[in-house]
Amino acid sequence: MSLTVPPALLEQAQQGAISEEDFLACVRTSLPYAWSVVAGTAEKLNANGGTVEINDDVPQNDKEWGQLFRMMASDSIRAAIERKFGVRLAFQNCCKVAAFAPDATAAYDEFTSMRAQVLNQRPELVDC
């Protein structure tokens, strides 16, 4: 399971639409490690006014790995976070999270290229 959904939010979803604010609160509570990585990366980008901010800290345990994988693999979670922070996210090498300014198309395209994926392989992360 990706998220620990409070009963009230589940009931709301069963009846219709939910607010993005409530959804993000559920994400933040359910995936605290992943939230801290992604939010921190996005906040640094926005504070610096640059085009890209990369966090390549390696998670310390399986729980942290799992949270990061679940967050970055979910289109709805990633899209909601992108809207909240006004960034575009990308993920590489099972732990490298990047936040891009919305207009940083060239940097995003390079980071998400096959070439960049090959160049960023690390032997210690083969089985991450």
Residue ranges of predicted features:
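Fe(II)/2-oxoglutarate oxygenase catalytic core
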Residues: 1-128
